Amino acid sequence: MTPFLLVLSSPSGGGKTTIARSLLQARTDVGYSVSATTRPPRPGERDGHDYHFLTGAEFERRVVAGEFLEHATYGGHRYGTLRAEIDRVLGNGCHAVLDIEVEGARQVMDRMPDAVRVFVLPPSAKVLVERLRSRDTETPATRRVRLARAAEELLA
């Protein structure tokens, strides 16, 4: 089978990363595209494995240089997919998996209409709230912003 791009998208806390990790563990012909972000690492996250952690200036330099397939601001931080990451995975003969937020997925589909997009619905609003709370990585104000954005994305 010809390698393809699989785009998993959902609101923050929707379950896309959990699904991506399960897929990567179950299949040897799937590779993960590591996203870039300006947010600080969460406990246990590693640069180049979970994300490419960039400064705001470095992120902007790469945007201007056209290195991103997609990028967006979410929860006060910038996130994006480096074209080189997709090329790396597909070039190794593997299917590439992205787990990205909803606006980024729209941008990818505009630029790569042959990609397969899966929108991941959280089981319920209550579960989504609990997932974000259990992360314990955000302030209540930031969590409210993420939940408001999630509501918009789920209604879109």
Locate predicted features:
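Walker A/P-loop
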Residues: 17
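Pre-Walker A (Motif I) flank of P-loop NTPase domains
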Residues: 2-6
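A glycine- and Lys/Arg-enriched "phosphate-lid" helix/loop adjacent to the NTP-binding pocket
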Residues: 39-46, 67-69, 90-95, 102, ...
